Amino acid sequence: RHEMVQIIADEVKKANVGVDIRIYPAKSLYKPKEQWKPMTTGQLDISAFPLAYASKFHPEFDATLMPGTVKNHDHALRFNKGPMMTEIKKIINDAGVVVLSDAWLGGGFASKTKCIKNPSDAKGQVMRAAGKAFNQMLEAAGAGIQSMPSSEIYTGLQTLSLIHI
């Protein structure tokens, strides 16, 4: 996300429009999940913000983080113009936030022991996922949930306290 905002800052600087974008790395200004409110009140101007981070205010935002939502770039372009994202963007705009760019990351599952292709493959596995709805989906499939910040995933996989992400 840092690199994405850096590209925006570099392009704005090249455009010479009198706007200076300063990036605050490593959660030094706001923690990632605390950025929604400052964006809605004008205290934070730009953020590369996963919408699911604001799901405690707008639960429907969690749907944007579900696996398989977007399959590739072409699908992302179509999806962004579809009814779900139209409604999501209305909520964003009504909160006073403007989307500068849409970004979708292809995601999936990683495992040290088996291939996770279907919900039934999660049964009995200890997994870590991002977002409340994602965790609920995995629990419904029979997985055990290991909560940990993304910064601790690598260590969790090394120590086997986490087998799947």
What are these regions (language model features)?
Residues 159:
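Flexible glycine/serine/alanine-rich "lid" or loop that lines and gates the nucleotide-sugar donor pocket
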Residues 1-7, 26-31:
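Extracytoplasmic "Venus flytrap"
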Residues 26, 150-151:
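An acidic- and aromatic-residue-enriched active-site/binding cleft used to recognize and process polar
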Residues 21-25:
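A short beta-strand-loop structural module common to alpha/beta enzyme folds
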Residues 9-18, 40, 45-46, 50-145, ...:
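Contiguous mixed-secondary-structure segments that line small-molecule binding/active-site clefts
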